[in-house]
Amino acid sequence: MLGLITGSGFDTISELDDAKPEVITTPFADVPITRGFLDGSPVVVLRRHGLGHRIPPHRIDYRANILAIHDAGATSVVATAVSGAIDATLKPGNLVLIDQFIDATHGRLGTFFDDEVRHTDMTEPYDPVLRSIVCQAANETGVPIVNGGTYVCTNGPRFETPAEIRMYQTVGATLVGMTGCPEVTLARELDLPYASIGVISNAAA
C-alpha cells in the first residue's frame, strides 16, 4: 500500500475517496493519518505538520511519523517537499524528483538506533525503483518532472541567508527545504522505500 506524506500546501487531497481518519499510536507520539483510495487503490496519508498545519519543521516528530505510516501498512512512501530553488533554471511550480540530500539540520532526533550500533547505507537514500515508478507515472500523465536533484535540508523555521545559499550552490545543491531530513533517513532505517518530490515555490534567498 502506498503511503503519502504531505507538507505545506497539501493539507487536503481532493481526489481521495472514502477518506477515514485514524490515529496510530507509536512509542514517540500518537499520529493522525487518513486512509482512503486514489483511483481505486488504497493509500494512507500523513500530514507532516499535523492537522491544521500547526507543527513547525524543527518540532516535527519525524520518528513518530515514519513509524506511524509504516505501522499503518504502507509498503512504500512518496513525500512532497515544498522547496526553494537553488538551481536558477528551476521556476515556481516545477517538480524535482530528488535523488540525493545534504543534511544541514541540527538537534533533530534522527534515528531509531539510539540503543544499538547500526550504520545505514545511504548510497541511494531515495529508492531507485520507486523513483522510476514516480517518473514513469509523471511521464504517462504528462506532468513535467526533473529526474534528479540534490536537496539541502535546513533546520528552519527561518529562511536561509544569501550567503548560505551561495555555499550550497558551490557543493552542487539543487533545491532547499526544511523537512526532508531526517525523514528520508528514518525510512531507510526501516527499509521502507521512499521517494520525495520537490515542489518549487520560490527562488531561494
Model feature map: region roles:
Residues 66, 165, 181-184:
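Generic hydrophobic/aromatic pocket-lining and core-packing "Φ" positions
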Residues 75-76, 174, 193:
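Short acidic/polar active-site loop segments enriched in Thr and Asp
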Residues 178-205:
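Zn-dependent metallopeptidase/amidohydrolase metal-coordination segment
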Residues 1-123:
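Metabolite-binding pocket within alpha/beta catalytic cores that recognizes anionic/polar moieties
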Residues 129, 133-144:
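Generic non-transmembrane alpha-helical segments
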Residues 140-174:
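Active-site/ligand-binding-proximal alpha/beta "capping" segment
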Residues 70-73, 169, 188:
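Non-catalytic positions within long, well-ordered alpha-helices that form the structural scaffold/packing
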